[in-house]
């Protein structure tokens, strides 16, 4: 493989010219993919720590970050290896879109329990379709809203934890937690929950091809992964401390069914 493929991420010359995303806009898009699209399992990270314990849970988080960061780099090298390669196969993108509609619909049902699940999925589909037709450069503004939502989510959990003194739900009076897994058979379950938050690779080629300066791809990826990991750690650690072995599949469910929340 040439030095260009080994050391640089140069955009292919045969791509149609158009207005591109800046480094900042690309970082917004990367972070939004990790935190809010494929990272919809962010609220499940406390459950992952519940099954894995502190030591293995934190180790798995950094391991998954490192592996997926590295494979994100390899992905673009593969993209540039041969001309005419732009995205994942269409069939895979369709499958991902369907799974996203299902995930969003399930999440919205918690906020709107009186609306049927099918109706919520239809609403999610109607929202996603127009967004899919917008140029990625302009989607970066929507990505910023998604990032702010993730930050607000963490802030709300932390504030609630420090303002409560009784269990469960208090950071100053935490629930019982474990250093090591209490059931080793559930460890693969934790691995799946954690790595899901870093699996945004199917969208990365599209964001990369839209960058004004594709040679800054590594910088954008490193910043995005570092920021996302900080958010993941905060929600996982705080959620596990607050609810311990009572942690539900999504930490917000602990709030939904707890008096006073």
Tell what function each PLM region has.
Residues 30-31, 55-59, 118-123:
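Hydrophobic alpha-helical transmembrane segments
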Residues 46-85:
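Extracellular loop-to-transmembrane helix junctions
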Residues 32, 60-61, 65, 220, ...:
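Alpha-helical transmembrane segments of multi-pass membrane proteins, especially transporters
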Residues 26-34, 38, 42-45, 59:
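Residue-level signal for short hydrophobic patches within transmembrane helices
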Residues 40, 65-74, 124-133:
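Central hydrophobic cores of alpha-helical transmembrane segments in multi-pass inner-membrane proteins
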Residues 2-13, 18-22, 27, 73, ...:
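Membrane-interfacial loop- and helix-cap regions that link adjacent transmembrane helices
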Residues 56-57, 138, 216-219:
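Residue-level recognition of membrane-helix boundary sites in multi-pass small-molecule transporters
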Residues 46-51, 107-111, 124-146, 210:
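Membrane-water interface regions at transmembrane-helix termini and the short interhelical loops
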